[in-house]
Every structure is written in C-alpha cells, then in structure tokens.
Amino acid sequence: MAVFRSTLVLLLIIVCLTTYELHVHAADGAKVGEGVVKIDCGGRCKDRCSKSSRTKLCLRACNSCCSRCNCVPPGTSGNTHLCPCYASITTHGGRLKCP
C-alpha cells in the first residue's frame, strides 16, 4: 500500500510540474512564433492562380489557405505534397478548398 501511495504522489508531482511548464511556455506566446518567417501570400498566390479561369475565386481561396498554412505549393497546380497543410484543408462539403 505504501508503494502505491508513493507512486501515486510521484505521478501527481510529475503531472503538476508538466502542467506548470506548459503554462509558463504558453505565457511567452510572443516568443513562440518569432522564428517563423511569413511568406508573401499575395505574390505566391498570384503565381499559383495565374492560369486559372476564375482568377478572383482562386486568389481568395489561395490567400485563405496560405494565411492558415504559411505555405503555397510551387507551380500553377499540383505539387500539394510539398505543403501538406495546404493539401488537407477542405470545404464544408468535403471538397479540397485550396487551389
């Protein structure tokens, strides 16, 4: 019984320390994304949608996806394997959103 209690107390201490560490790092929210460089979504999407028959619709969808993922696959179509986040966003109907 004593072994069970000591194990339980040790586990509780570990959980509390882990929770504390997560809260401390979350408080430094400004520092979390400092190393990430934002890409030029407008320029990348302009290139991506340059051959689209519905350019405005393509640009709107592309910019939305780029702002979420900070990534636009190269070329005018395809290459979505280079940007998995971009390739996984779907509409409410289950269709791929990003051009």
UniProtKB/Swiss-Prot annotation:
Transmembrane segments: none annotated. Belongs to the GASA family. The keyword Transmembrane does not apply. Six disulfide bonds may be present. One of its GO terms (cellular component) is extracellular region. Gibberellin-regulated protein that may function in hormonal controlled steps of development such as seed germination, flowering and seed maturation. It is found in: Secreted. Dry seeds and maturating siliques. One of its GO terms (biological process) is gibberellic acid mediated signaling pathway. Keywords: Disulfide bond, Gibberellin signaling pathway, Secreted, Signal. This is Gibberellin-regulated protein 2. Residues 1-26 form the signal peptide. The keyword Signal applies. It comes from the Eukaryota. Pfam families: GASA.
